[in-house]
Amino acid sequence: MREKTKKLSSILLCLVFCFSFSTAVYAASYIYYDGGLKSATVDVENRLSNSSVYKNSVSAWNSTNTPVNIKTVPGSGHSYVIDGVYNDTWYGLYTPKNRQWIISGRAGKFTIELNRKELVSESDNFWQSVLVHELGHAFCLDDNP
């Protein structure tokens, strides 16, 4: 009887360890998005009506321990962030531009649109969280289903 208990305890302990390690590995993974930029350095034009939301979001990304480098540049011809009133329920929308192939592949530029219709009553922190999220798509991070 004691031998059976020992075997059962060993099996249960093994299962607990296996489950613990597999959960930790899963938690560290991310979902890859193939419409992200070809480079981790990007020139972005700020067209937002609230420039502090943009500055804080860019600062948050640039201060991470990643190779991301977002440079703010004036003028057209670059990726840009803009807000407007859109007749839809989304908060933010990332659109890749100049893709490697006709309809797929990594992007050369992007547009991020923030929907004032949905965000009008939200705090600056909420706006910033939406922009930080959308900028994540530029660096190949997909939505978590």
Language model regions located:
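Sec-dependent N-terminal signal peptides of Gram-positive bacterial secreted proteins and lipoproteins
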Residues: 1-27
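Zinc-dependent metalloendopeptidases
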Residues: 25-145
